[in-house]
Amino acid sequence: MRHLVLIGFMGSGKSSLAQELGLALKLEVLDTDMIISERVGLSVRGIFEELGEDNFRMFEKNLIDELKTLKTPHIISTGGGIVMHDNLKGLGTTFYLKMDFETLIKRLNQKEREKRPLLNDLTQAKELFEKRQVLYEKNASFIIDARGGLNNSLKQVLQFIA
């Protein structure tokens, strides 16, 4: 088995699904945003504000290369922009958690939105969502309809890997 990599826009449920998959498959879960935050000593928002998005993306790209060297399979929950990196291919079997923009925004309360610097302006966020959707689909091994909730998404992934 290869790494199972969850991609999708912020708020699509990648972190929650990763935890459930980890339990179901008895695999370690890695979260790229969390790893970067711990290494840098700042939240994702803090990295964006103090070091800039370009530096965050560099950390992300380097982490992808590092994760490719792991010998055992993991569940990898990624940040929403990870699909912008050309080195994502080959990391593992990729699952795109697809959800419409309006549902994503409803799922995120104000406190959650404040943690996500790219959601400060919803008009810009929708444009970003539309641009990234193409990249998510291009990078996906499988597309998961994430509108049905966590259990439904879990069932879909487990069916694909059975």
Swiss-Prot record:
Protein name as annotated: Shikimate kinase
Record keywords, A-Z: Amino-acid biosynthesis, Aromatic amino acid biosynthesis, ATP-binding, Cytoplasm, Kinase, Magnesium, Metal-binding, Nucleotide-binding, Transferase
Residues binding Mg(2+), per UniProt: S15
UniProt cofactor note: Binds 1 Mg(2+) ion per subunit.
Superkingdom field: Bacteria
Cofactor: Mg(2+)
EC number of this enzyme: 2.7.1.71
Main location: cytoplasm
Keyword Secreted: no
Family annotation (Pfam families): SKI
Keyword Transferase: yes
Molecular function as annotated in GO: ATP binding; magnesium ion binding; shikimate kinase activity
Gene3D superfamilies in UniProt: P-loop containing nucleotide triphosphate hydrolases
Cell compartments where the protein resides: Cytoplasm
BP-aspect Gene Ontology terms: amino acid biosynthetic process; aromatic amino acid family biosynthetic process; chorismate biosynthetic process
Catalytic activity: shikimate + ATP = 3-phosphoshikimate + ADP + H(+)
Listed GO CC annotations: cytosol
Pathway annotation from the record: Metabolic intermediate biosynthesis; chorismate biosynthesis; chorismate from D-erythrose 4-phosphate and phosphoenolpyruvate: step 5/7
Function: Catalyzes the specific phosphorylation of the 3-hydroxyl group of shikimic acid using ATP as a cosubstrate.
Residues annotated to bind ATP: G11, S12, G13, K14, S15, S16, R116
Record SUPFAM superfamilies: P-loop containing nucleoside triphosphate hydrolases
Family annotation (InterPro entries): P-loop_NTPase, Shikimate/glucono_kinase, Shikimate_kinase/TSH1, Shikimate_kinase_CS
